[in-house]
């Protein structure tokens, strides 16, 4: 199954956070929080403005983005957990 987001939605795969702190302490899975970063896998065509013109999204496939812990809707595709969310739910693009 392939997903093609509609309108101003994006599909994001969470990027797992480090399980060891800088000082070497290992964080167990049950104490670790959900990652709040991910990679954009697909983007919708955009959102229409009041004049009916299509406005493209600011993010693109491959961007690393920040989002809230509880943002988006989780879906399972080929054993992967992906998030479907609106572009407005994204906080920032992480520049390399």
Swiss-Prot record:
It is found in: Cytoplasm. GO terms for biological process: chaperone cofactor-dependent protein refolding. InterPro entries: Chaperonin_GroES, Chaperonin_GroES_sf, Chaprnonin_Cpn10_CS, GroES-like_sf. CDD domains: cpn10. Keywords: Chaperone, Cytoplasm. The keyword Aminoacyl-tRNA synthetase does not apply. Pfam families: Cpn10. Its main location: cytoplasm. One of its GO terms (molecular function) is protein-folding chaperone binding. GO terms for cellular component: cytoplasm. Together with the chaperonin GroEL, plays an essential role in assisting protein folding. The GroEL-GroES system forms a nano-cage that allows encapsulation of the non-native substrate proteins and provides a physical environment optimized to promote and accelerate protein folding. GroES binds to the apical surface of the GroEL ring, thereby capping the opening of the GroEL channel. Heptamer of 7 subunits arranged in a ring. Interacts with the chaperonin GroEL. Belongs to the GroES chaperonin family. This is Co-chaperonin GroES. It comes from Verminephrobacter eiseniae (strain EF01-2). The lineage of its organism: Bacteria, Pseudomonadati, Pseudomonadota, Betaproteobacteria, Burkholderiales.
């Amino acid at each position: 199954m392939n997903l093609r987001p509609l309108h101003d939605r994006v599909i994001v795969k969470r990027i797992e956070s480090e399980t060891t702190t800088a000082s070497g302490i290992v964080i167990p899975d049950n104490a670790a929080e959900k990652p709040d970063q991910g990679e954009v896998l697909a983007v919708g065509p955009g959102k229409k403005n009041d004049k009916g013109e299509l406005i493209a999204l600011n993010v693109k496939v491959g961007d690393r983005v920040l989002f809230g812990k509880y943002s988006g809707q989780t879906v399972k595709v080929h054993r992967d957990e992906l998030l479907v969310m609106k572009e407005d739910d994204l906080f920032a693009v992480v520049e390399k």
